Amino acid sequence: NTVSSVRFFSAYVQDQISISAHIDIIVGARYDRFEIKGVDIFDNNRAFARTDEKVSPRFGLILKPRDNISIYSSYSQSFLPRSGDQFLSLTPTTQNLAPEKFTNYEAGAKWDIRPNLNVTAALFQLDRTNATTPSPANPLVIINAGTTRTRGLELALTGKITKAWQISGGYTWQDAYIKGNDAIR
């Protein structure tokens, strides 16, 4: 349906700073710029274009009470350009919608029980703004769904059985819901 050209630029910087033998701080930022231009060949060659750019910060704190245990927390932001992660969803009707923005909070622990056996656990919350969905009134029209929130728990166990064999197991629980836009609740 469309012919598009995409230009993308990204730069990322991060530093993990040891405050003491047991405390590290992580500070980082990422800059992204997406430019997409296209023509909808089934809509009288209707042109569309969009440029999205954002600086996304990342902060973390790692506590290491013992050599084999770390407790961490992190905060990060990211975004998804309106064209989507595959650059295929931008159209003349969606080009004016704001990009999706994500804010993630996470806290967890990692424990190396033995050199060949470790356990991880994490709690997380992911808030997303400017999510989109098909309109209940007309599924061909994309509307802003508002804000979503996903909270969850992740557990993982990884171990080496032999030098050549490793086994991993994990569990994730999530609770997600839409906080905004009464039209789609």
Which residue ranges define each predicted feature?
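Flexible, solvent-exposed loop segments that connect beta-strands
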Residues: D40-A47, A137-V141, K179-R185
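Structural signature of Gram-negative outer-membrane beta-barrels, strongest in the C-terminal barrel
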Residues: S4-R128, T150, T172-D175
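Conserved beta-strand positions that form and line the central face of beta-propeller blades
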Residues: N96, V141-N144
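Short, well-ordered secondary-structure micro-motifs
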Residues: S83-G84, A131-T132, K179-D182
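Gram-negative outer-membrane beta-barrel transporters
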Residues: A21, Q125-D127, N144-R185
